[in-house]
Amino acid sequence: MAHGCYWKKCSFGDVSLDYIGRYEGASAAVLADRIEAIVRETGQTGFHFVDEAAPPKSLKALATELIARNTDISWWGNIRFEKTFSPELCELLADSGCIAVSGGLEVASDRLLNLMKKGVSVDQV
């Protein structure tokens, strides 16, 4: 979905590394075009997006595009626990073929999450 990390604030993320510090996202239409090309060329219908974390807005756009195109795939990827990552968004993602997401939960302590600059709370997760 993208190259790099859109958050870039975690205390442990080395944003001096090119693959983390530079964020370049692809549009939902471009991603859907690429997915459809791979399905046509290879017959593969399972996709694992290995972004550092996909923004909820990008996930929503991709899901909407896949549904509009009637693209029949299974996909999964990585997320940050954002306030906008709602049950409704999860339903939309599932409708588009998303079978799983994994989120980075390094600790279950608000104090440590703040020290790590994760930008989330235990309650959000």
Q: Which stretches of residues belong to each language-model region?
A:
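Conserved SAM/AdoMet-binding glycine-rich loop
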Residues: 32-125
